[in-house]
Every structure is written in structure tokens, then in C-alpha cells.
């Protein structure tokens, strides 16, 4: 008796051809995905590749830190108007920033003595000339923050007033008011580091800075008049440190 059902012949598929077709298809998809539109610098909607971004020569700048050109202008003022040796001017600039670390980098700061490399030129005179370049002591010092940090560690000489302003001994090297510029890419980079600041040193500086600003706010007070009957003769705040605001989270 003959089976009426049609016998199906199995199809033999070449495994090597199947794998080759799969690879070809996959390669085509990869090529399609990795071929973005060509970047056009005249089209603001065009997205640049990493290679395109290499054309941008950006210099990190911030208004809180003097630029190399501004520091150079200060040094030229010193050379033209004083007897400092031109071949030592960079070291004298660092000496000035180190002196500000002891007394505070503000226009009210009184700089003492003279740099050892220019013993006939008072630091106070150099500070006056620096003001003529249009940059503040804080901007000037912040440029050298990393160098000053290195110098103090290298010589084991912390800022003079570290205990007076409330730092513990473990964090005393962070006790200068332009310390936050040590982490800024806009500050002059040392050729080598003694060490980088620790997180605890950063935190200690932040807390003491916050406390100092709070003290100033309390001393300023909230009075809007000088009439003695109203302010009872007080010109500053009535509260002391326990009344400080909560520290920032």
C-alpha cells in the first residue's frame, strides 16, 4: 500500500554560509551606526567628535584668580619702579603671596619687612605697586595658592595665625584665606607636590571661613539708623557665636 502523503525532503543549510551572512549583516549594521554625519563648524546643530574638539585651545580662567598676563604686569611694575633683581622676580612674587598667607590676603593687610631676595624693597611698597595693576591681593595670591601650600609644607611653616583663627593642629596648613584656590585649575601648577590637601583640611577651612563670615555679619548688626534712642548705642550685632546660623549642609 502506497502512502498518499508527500514525503518532505529536508533542506541542508551550509553552516559556514549562514555564519558568513550573519557576519556581513552585523558588519553592515555596525558600519551604519559608527558613521555619524560629518561635523560642520558653521552649523550650530552639528555635533562635534572628540577629534573636532581638539581644535579648541581653552585656557581655564576665573575672575577670582589673576591670569598669568596679570601677574606678569605686576612683576614688570616691580622691576621698573624698584630695585628688585629681574632674574628673581618670580620668587619675590611667591614670597609676597606667602607673606599674605600669614596676615590675610586683603587690601587692609599690613605686610611686614622685605623679601630676603630684595632686602631694600619693603613688601608694603610692592603691595602698593601691585594695586596699580588692577588686581586684588586675593586674586594675586590665589594664582600662587598651590605654590604657597607646597612651600609651607616643604619648610614645615604653617600660616602664622592658624591657632588664633581657630584651626586645630592637624589642619593648621589650611589656615590661609586663599586656600580654596589650591584645588583650582586656574592656579599655577607646581612642578611637583609635597602632598595634596586632605578632605579634612578642606572641611576645616570651609567651617572656619563660614564662622569668620558669620562673625562679620553679627558685628555689622541689623540697625538701619544711628539714633541712640532706638539702637541703645549699639553699632554691631547683639549676639555672639552661639547665635550663628547653622552651617551649610
UniProtKB/Swiss-Prot annotation:
Alphabetized UniProt keyword annotations: Capsid protein, Helical capsid protein, Ribonucleoprotein, Virion
InterPro entries (alphabetical): Pltvir_coat
Cystine pairings recorded for this chain: none
Source domain of life: Viruses
GO MF assignments: structural molecule activity
Compartments reported by the entry: Virion
Pfam family, one: Flexi_CP
Region (Disordered): 1-28
Keyword rRNA processing: no
GO cellular component term of the entry, any: ribonucleoprotein complex
The keyword Ribonucleoprotein belongs to this UniProt entry's keyword annotation: yes
Function: Required for genome encapsidation. Forms ribonucleoprotein complexes along with TGB1 helicase and viral RNA.
Family: Belongs to the potexvirus capsid protein family.
Protein name (record): Coat protein
Organism listed in the record: Potato aucuba mosaic virus
Amino acid at each position: 500500500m502506497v502512502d498518499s502523503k508527500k514525503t518532505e525532503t529536508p533542506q541542508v543549510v551550509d553552516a559556514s554560509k549562514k555564519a558568513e551572512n550573519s557576519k556581513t549583516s552585523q558588519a553592515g549594521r555596525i558600519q551604519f551606526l559608527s558613521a555619524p554625519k560629518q561635523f560642520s563648524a558653521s552649523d550650530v546643530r552639528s555635533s562635534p567628535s572628540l577629534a573636532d574638539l581638539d581644535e579648541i585651545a581653552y585656557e581655564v580662567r576665573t575672575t577670582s584668580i589673576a591670569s598669568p598676563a596679570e601677574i606678569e604686569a605686576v612683576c614688570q611694575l616691580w622691576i621698573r619702579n624698584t630695585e628688585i633683581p629681574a632674574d628673581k622676580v618670580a620668587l619675590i612674587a611667591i614670597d609676597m603671596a606667602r607673606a599674605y598667607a600669614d596676615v590675610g590676603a586683603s587690601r587692609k593687610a599690613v605686610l611686614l619687612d622685605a623679601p630676603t631676595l630684595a632686602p631694600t624693597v619693603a613688601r608694603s611698597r610692592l603691595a602698593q605697586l601691585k594695586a596699580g595693576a588692577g588686581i586684588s591681593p586675593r586674586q594675586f595670591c590665589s594664582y600662587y595658592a598651590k605654590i604657597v601650600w607646597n612651600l609651607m609644607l616643604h619648610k614645615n611653616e604653617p600660616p602664622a595665625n592658624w591657632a588664633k583663627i581657630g584651626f586645630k593642629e592637624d589642619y593648621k596648613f589650611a589656615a590661609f584665606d586663599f586656600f580654596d584656590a589650591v584645588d583650582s585649575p586656574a592656579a599655577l601648577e607646581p612642578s611637583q607636590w609635597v602632598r595634596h590637601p586632605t578632605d579634612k583640611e578642606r572641611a576645616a577651612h570651609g567651617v572656619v571661613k563660614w564662622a569668620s563670615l558669620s562673625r562679620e555679619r553679627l558685628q555689622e548688626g541689623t540697625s538701619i539708623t544711628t539714633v541712640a534712642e532706638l539702637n541703645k548705642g549699639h553699632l554691631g550685632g547683639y549676639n555672639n557665636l552661639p547665635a550663628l546660623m547653622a552651617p551649610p549642609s
